[in-house]
Regions:
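Polytopic membrane enzymes that build or remodel cell-surface glycoconjugates and lipids
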Residues: 1-519, 526-533, 544-546, 551, ...
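TPR/Sel1-like alpha-solenoid repeat signature
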Residues: 471-478, 490, 504-515, 524, ...
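Helix-start (N-cap) detector for alpha-helical repeat units in TPR-like alpha-solenoids
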Residues: 468-469, 502-503, 536, 546, ...
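Conserved structural position within tetratricopeptide repeats
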Residues: 462, 493-496, 529-530, 537, ...
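Terminal, low-structured helical/coil segments at or just beyond the last alpha-helical repeat
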Residues: 645-676
Length: 676
């Protein structure tokens, strides 16, 4: 079987195995289903555009995903895609996630323009890109990794990659498409590296790598992967000229890599602040943190080797922390590290110490070179997720294993092909077919889990029953659908796992508010405010605290307790003052104060509160809320009998918008009052 046929077969198998992913909905990070809703301009005071409150993962989410991302679904300037993060928030914003993937957003935007806001076109785009990625992976194996591209081994590696169940999160979710798109250009960069000579060849490799990075940050690792594999092949070949050329290429690629990395770091205005809820291992005690990180690396390797148990989220209590260095998990992690180091050392010795490949004859490829190449593909793209330089916002994320899985498939395919060569002829095909059938069955089943929010979160609960976040996700979905009893049970189950989780108190407060159980809602919101000291130190937490004061005041106002409500709104204003990240909460706090003061007949103070809301909203570009606050101030001035001041503000609105119907109506009302 030729290389082109192996590429086509791998792509075809990938399309067949992931065909049922085309019927999936928008789920998980594709959209938010939490009670907070998404940022939007409103005509009445509502929860602010900043927080996003409890998203599908039960966390405070200060970002938008595909469905709510204005850079995808609105006609924002194309330049905004290069100024905003992946979720549509400006990089300069203190609440930006700092994930910079403008080409992924551009791809989603193109799909939206062509197919509308339906999940099918988005899934189809990712599905097609996955087939291309699988074909390119086979080509990388044929042209870059293997000196002797035996057709059977080539096809086996390609099918292992095409059928790997850990790819489901990247292929079956729309947001995960960033990984798939990036992999296409990652493989193109690696493909170009062996022949790269001179400025033009280096520029081509670097261009592909930069494009990959603009789809997903890990894409830039194509440069070190390509350089490392080229050096390995040169060392195994034993030709001095190739080694010298490889060293020169590696040095040039390293310089470009560092320059691009410096530019990317320069784009980051700040690093996001995470908590133990997102990445528990990063907050383990100092003496145990390294052990926990080492175990997390081993856990990721287990997902690649044995992808039987998969989950859309591995945060919180999914992976219990190592509490003693003498724990079996810690010892197993250390043993695995030593074993990996020994295998790498032996492979390196095989590359450097054995007869060059060119003198061995056909089929006598340097096994150590192939194994080390697989290690490079597995480890280097995983480095950004290893918490080495900065803390990342997750413990384990299956989608970031997409590129590292290529290395595992190279190693596994090579070893399995060698073992099959020693097996009886009548047993080879059945054994390999059985393994591939197992992978295909797991992949098809996992795609079904990604079809809807209910099936996805239900599978996550089965896989990680101690992760309170997945209970919160499913509870949020049920609350959105109006199944409040189911949602309440899930939120309480989450609280049983993590009693101090302020997010669950908040979600229960929203649920009780929807039911009209105001006493229970007030108690839940107060519980949320009292249980979040750890989170309150972050930007997100400060916004959330201000929002909670506003929510508490809203409930108190509905309960007929205006004085208590005013105290809560004052607390919201105090918590939000002077912080650009909390401008929307500050506007809401002033507007709510104005509404309560108006209800008490204190119209002068009510007008002052609404005018304060107007000034803050105007200063921060919240134009819809600014206009609403101005009209509320005018109404209060009219009620206070300050007609001249009211007319002055109406005339200012009419000068800016002569056709404003509401201003005309207020002007007519003033005239009638004057005639009376």
């Amino acid at each position: 079987m030729g290389g082109r046929r192996a590429e086509a077969l791998a792509a075809g198998v990938a399309l067949a195995a992931f065909a049922n992913a085309l019927r999936g909905d928008f789920v998980f990070d594709d959209f938010r289903c939490g009670p907070g809703g998404g940022p939007r301009e409103e005509t009445k005071p509502r929860p602010p555009p900043g927080p996003g409150l409890t998203g599908p993962d039960g966390r405070l989410r200060l970002r938008r995903a595909v469905v709510e991302n204005p850079d995808v679904v609105k006609a924002t300037p194309l330049a905004d895609l290069f100024r905003n993060d992946f979720w549509g928030t400006p990089l300069a914003s203190p609440v930006s996630h700092q994930s910079y993937r403008p080409l992924a957003v551009l791809a989603f935007r193109a799909v939206f323009r062509l197919g509308g806001l339906r999940p099918e076109p988005f899934h189809a785009a990712v599905w097609a890109a996955y087939a291309v990625s699988c074909a390119l992976f086979v080509r990388v194996c044929r042209r870059v990794v293997f000196a002797d591209p035996a057709p059977g081994r080539l096809l086996l590696c390609g099918l292992l990659f095409a059928l790997h169940p850990v790819h489901c999160e990247a292929v079956a979710s729309v947001v995960g498409g960033a990984e798939v798109f990036a992999s296409v250009f990652f493989f193109l960069s690696v493909l170009a590296s062996p022949a790269a000579a001179g400025v033009g060849g280096l520029a081509r490799c670097c261009a592909y790598a930069v494009v990959a990075m603009l789809f997903k940050e890990q894409g830039i690792m194509a440069l070190p992967v390509g350089a490392a594999v080229r050096l390995l092949r040169a060392a195994a070949g034993g030709r001095r000229a190739e080694v010298v050329a490889g060293v020169k290429y590696a040095a040039a690629a390293a310089a470009v890599f560092l320059a691009v990395l410096a530019c990317r770091v320069g784009l980051a205005r700040h690093f996001p602040t995470w908590t133990r809820h997102e990445n528990p291992a990063a907050f383990a005690p100092d003496g145990l943190r390294a052990w926990n990180h080492l175990y997390i690396y081993l856990f990721n390797l287990r997902l690649l080797i044995l992808p039987a148990t998969l989950s859309c989220d591995w945060g919180m209590g999914s992976i219990p922390l190592i509490s003693r260095a003498s724990e079996p998990r810690a010892l197993a992690s250390a043993l695995a590290l030593l074993l990996a180091a020994a295998v790498a050392a032996l492979s390196l010795a095989a590359v450097c110490g054995r007869r060059p490949e060119g003198r061995r004859g056909k089929g006598k490829e340097n096994l150590g070179c192939v194994l080390l190449a697989g290690v490079c593909f597995a480890v280097l793209p995983f480095l950004p997720s290893m918490n080495l330089l900065v803390v990342v916002g997750f413990a384990v994320a299956e989608r970031v294993l997409f590129l590292p899985s290529a290395g595992l498939c190279i190693i596994a395919g090579t070893l399995l092909h060698r073992l099959a060569g020693r097996a009886p002829r009548h047993a080879k095909l059945p054994l390999v077919t059985f393994l591939l059938a197992l992978l295909a069955a797991r992949t098809v089943a996992r795609n079904r889990a990604w079809r809807s929010a209910e099936s996805l979160f239900g599978a996550a609960i089965a896989a990680a029953p101690r992760n309170e976040k997945v209970y919160a996700m499913l509870g949020d979905k049920h609350m959105k659908d109006g199944a409040l009893d189911r949602a309440e049970g899930l939120f309480k189950a989450a609280l049983a796992l993590e009693p101090g989780d302020f997010k669950m108190h908040y979600s229960l407060g929203v649920l009780y508010q929807q039911r009209g159980a105001l006493d229970a809602s007030l108690a839940a919101f107060r519980g949320a405010l009292a249980t979040g000291p750890e989170f309150s130190a972050t930007i997100n937490g400060r916004v959330f605290a201000a929002h909670l004061h506003n929510k508490i005041g809203d409930v108190q106002s509905r309960m007929g307790r205006p004085d208590a409500a005013l105290e809560s709104f004052d607390a919201a204003v105090a918590a939000a003052a002077g912080d650009a990240a909390q401008a929307a909460e500050l506007v809401l706090g002033h507007a709510n104060r104005g509404a309560v003061l108006g209800g008490l007949g204190r119209w002068g103070k009510s007008a002052g509160a609404h005018e304060a809301a107007y000034k803050v909203a105007g200063a921060h570009g919240l134009h819809g809320r600014a206009l609403e606050a101005l009209f509320a101030a005018i109404e209060a001035l009219v009620a206070a009998g300050r007609h001249a001041a009211a007319r002055e503000r109406i005339e200012a609105v009419l000068r800016a918008d002569p056709r404003n119907a509401r201003s005309r109506a207020l002007e007519g009302r003033l005239l009638r009052l004057a005639d009376g």
